[in-house]
């Protein structure tokens, strides 16, 4: 599923034209050795293809054998490696908690809920943009990189949030949007007026002469949100590049002054105490200097569609990697000069695997991002995926990730439908079990711990997402990102406990009286309590340091195993089908074992501490189980 394309119920998604091309990343066919996570696990990755009569069953086995350094954890290790096994919780500030009754979430609201993260077990939060903005794209159009959007509060409110978070042991990550600013930023106004020093802060071009003294765009480049990526500016009498909305002009990073200005922005927020940054839309930062037309993709006949072209001149140019490496050095230097935890950088971009891996490091080992986001659970897998598909995409990332780096697993975000809406309401617990028991880093979008669902019936009058508004009354529902951005459902009180106001910036989902945090905290079994149990389990040595094996047991069920010498083995088994399945895990676990259930889902017929027979593990539709193995 490509940026600009929306999820549709019942549709089977394929990779976009960019990622459908066969590459040497398509299927690993030879053993590969890797380091995984901060524990220096080393292992060999294997795959085997089993062909049966009338059915091709892919059994992909990924086995990481333990080889760890012998040392005791200490504060230095914690400061260096704190992020490698972290669960980062994404907060969409506008929707998280409103403190003043205006219907819009804010910084004081987030601060008031920091204890919630302590209670849940979350120790790192990532804030979507909070900078000053005209809110054309709800904060991803920044008019001042050093100030707070007034609706969200003040710089003093931000300082108070950081102070309280530090007191509670919570690290704060900021969204950083470098590709473009708002057209209301002083830089753009000065550039449009050709003020000295700012003439080339943005990408300006004359265009091509058209009929009747008109000017046509310089080339065929298409915006992510459809239509030309070039916008005519009457005052300057030139086109400016805008790969997103017309209110988001692309900055010109071939101008050293722009790089320096953004370096200073990063240092400004580092000095305020943030633990790092999520770099937005990193793949778009540079474009072809020659402005060459991009070739047709053959995916669609619509010239306004983002899928109309192969984006070889506007995405993932080599200079993108160089800039990320430059910012990594800036962060490393800041960490070296300022005691405390490593300041980290995670990058966001939907791209082919071979291109994403370059954001970790280049072929010479020069370090880039601490990790580029892995969107496979969003773009490659869906409710119709079979068990071997899950194992394959998990294995693929681990196989081609450079040695010494950490994997990550993004389950949802503000641009895509929620887990419960993509995979089905009954899958929420199983998907959280999967994310929490895989090696590396987990990314949780707010409300996913509760199983919140998209509000697909938001009316045209209540729609605020700009691309949806541009799509018009007949098409807005297929484009809108509003359904996954509705207010956090804290309780069954007015506005789900999000706000005391008479209205909220987006409607609260009508199911809030049944689906909310307070109800789930008080229930014997709930999605929240499953999530809480998984967070606690992640602190176990076997999940932090253990080896990893994955296998499709049949077309509908797969299992992952985590092992560490001297520790009980953990087994996660997931049924991705809508039918009850019974599987034999005896061969997968090798030795006779006692199986004891540690975590079960809300609707499971099993109960925690129940004993299972390896040859008769029964799973309800879409059920996941986390099992502890002890040798007899």
Curated annotation (Swiss-Prot):
In terms of Gene3D superfamilies, this protein maps to:
Glycosidases (3.20.20.80), Golgi alpha-mannosidase II (2.60.40.1180), Oligo-1,6-glucosidase, Domain 2 (3.90.400.10)
Q: Where is the composition biased (Basic and acidic residues)?
A: 1-29
Q: Which reaction does it catalyse?
A: Hydrolysis of terminal, non-reducing (1->4)-linked alpha-D-glucose residues with release of alpha-D-glucose
EC numbers for this chain:
3.2.1.20
Annotated glycosylation sites = 179, 212, 333, 461, 575, 578
Its EC top class is hydrolase
Q: Which UniProt keywords apply?
A: Glycoprotein, Glycosidase, Hydrolase, Signal
Disordered as annotated region, ranges: 1-30
Q: For site (Transition state stabilizer), what residue positions does UniProt give?
A: 415
A GO BP entry is:
carbohydrate metabolic process
Q: Which residues form the active site?
A: 280, 348
Q: Which GO terms describe its molecular function?
A: alpha-1,4-glucosidase activity
Q: Which CDD domains match?
A: AmyAc_maltase
Query: What family classification does the UniProt entry report for this protein?
Result: Belongs to the glycosyl hydrolase 13 family.
Q: What is this protein called?
A: Maltase 1
């Amino acid at each position: 599923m490509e940026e600009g394309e929306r999820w549709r119920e019942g549709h089977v998604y394929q990779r976009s034209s960019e990622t459908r091309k066969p590459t040497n990343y398509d299927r690993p066919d030879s053993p590969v050795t890797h380091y995984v996570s901060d524990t220096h696990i080393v292992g060999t990755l294997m795959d085997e293809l089993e062909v049966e009569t009338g059915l091709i069953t892919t059994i992909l086995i990924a086995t990481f054998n333990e080889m760890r350094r012998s040392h005791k954890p200490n504060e230095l290790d914690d400061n260096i490696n704190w992020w490698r096994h972290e669960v980062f919780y994404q907060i969409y500030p506008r929707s998280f908690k409103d403190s003043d009754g205006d219907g819009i979430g804010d910084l004081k609201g987030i601060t008031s809920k920091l204890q919630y993260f302590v209670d849940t077990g979350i120790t790192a939060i990532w804030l979507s943009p909070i900078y000053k903005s005209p809110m054309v794209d709800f904060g991803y159009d920044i008019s001042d990189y050093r100030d707070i959007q007034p609706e969200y509060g003040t710089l003093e409110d931000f300082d108070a949030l950081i102070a309280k978070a530090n007191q509670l042991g919570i690290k704060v990550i900021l969204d950083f949007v470098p590709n473009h600013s708002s057209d209301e930023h002083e830089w753009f106004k000065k550039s449009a007026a050709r003020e000295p020093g700012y003439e080339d802060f943005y990408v300006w071009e004359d265009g091509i002469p058209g009929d009747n003294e008109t000017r046509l765009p310089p080339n065929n480049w298409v915006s992510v949100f459809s239509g030309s990526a070039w916008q005519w500016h009457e005052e300057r009498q030139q086109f400016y590049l805008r790969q997103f909305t017309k209110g988001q002009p692309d900055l010109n990073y071939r101008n050293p002054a722009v790089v320096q200005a953004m370096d200073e922005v990063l240092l400004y927020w580092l000095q305020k105490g943030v633990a790092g940054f999520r770099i937005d839309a990193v793949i778009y930062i540079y474009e072809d200097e020659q402005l060459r037309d991009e070739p047709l993709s053959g995916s669609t006949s619509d010239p306004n569609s983002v899928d109309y072209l192969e984006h070889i001149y506007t995405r993932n140019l080599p200079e993108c990697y160089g800039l990320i490496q430059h910012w990594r050095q800036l962060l490393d230097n800041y960490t070296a000069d300022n005691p405390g935890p490593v300041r980290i950088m995670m990058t966001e971009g939907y791209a082919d695997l071979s291109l994403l891996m370059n954001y970790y490091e280049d072929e010479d080992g020069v370090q880039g991002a601490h990790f580029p986001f892995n969107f496979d659970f969003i773009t490659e897998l869906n409710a119709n995926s079979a068990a071997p598909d899950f194992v394959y995409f998990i294995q693929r990332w681990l196989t081609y990730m450079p040695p010494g780096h950490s994997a990550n697993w993004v389950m949802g975000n503000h641009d895509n439908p929620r887990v419960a809406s993509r995979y089905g309401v009954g899958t929420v617990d199983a998907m959280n079990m999967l994310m929490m028991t895989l090696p590396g880093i987990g990314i949780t979008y707010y409300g996913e711990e509760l199983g919140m669902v998209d509000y697909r019936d938001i009316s045209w009058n209540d729609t605020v997402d700009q691309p949806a508004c541009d799509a018009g009354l007949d098409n807005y529902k297929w484009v809108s990102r509003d359904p996954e951005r509705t207010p956090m459902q804290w309780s069954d009180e007015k506005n789900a406990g999000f706000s005391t106001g008479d209205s909220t910036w987006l409607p609260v989902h009508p199911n809030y009286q049944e689906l909310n945090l307070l109800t789930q905290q008080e229930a014997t079994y709930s999605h929240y309590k499953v999530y809480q149990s998984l967070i606690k389990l992640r602190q176990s040595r076997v999940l932090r340091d253990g080896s990893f094996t994955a296998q499709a047991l049949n077309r509908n069920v797969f299992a992952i195993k985590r092992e560490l010498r001297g520790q009980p083995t953990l087994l996660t088994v997931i049924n991705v089908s809508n039918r009850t399945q019974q599987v034999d895990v005896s061969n997968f676990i090798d030795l006779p074992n006692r199986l004891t259930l540690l975590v079960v889902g809300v609707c499971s017929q099993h109960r925690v501490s129940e004993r299972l027979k390896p040859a008769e593990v029964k799973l309800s539709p879409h059920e996941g189980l986390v099992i502890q193995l002890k040798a007899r």
